[in-house]
């Protein structure tokens, strides 16, 4: 019997929550701004 792994797909992750996707919308830009303010090392996936 094969195991189901819970590894996500990188392309899908990028398309949903990547930096360029975030920059497209007003709320996405707000997310980036908040994460910059908090000093996050990773702003987006």
From Swiss-Prot:
Residues 1-27 are annotated as: Disordered. It holds the Pfam family Ribosomal_L34. Residues 10-27 have a biased composition (Basic residues). One of its GO terms (molecular function) is structural constituent of ribosome. Keywords: Ribonucleoprotein, Ribosomal protein. This is Large ribosomal subunit protein bL34. One of its GO terms (biological process) is translation. It comes from the Bacteria. The keyword DNA damage does not apply. It comes from Synechococcus sp. (strain RCC307). Belongs to the bacterial ribosomal protein bL34 family. GO terms for cellular component: ribonucleoprotein complex; ribosome.
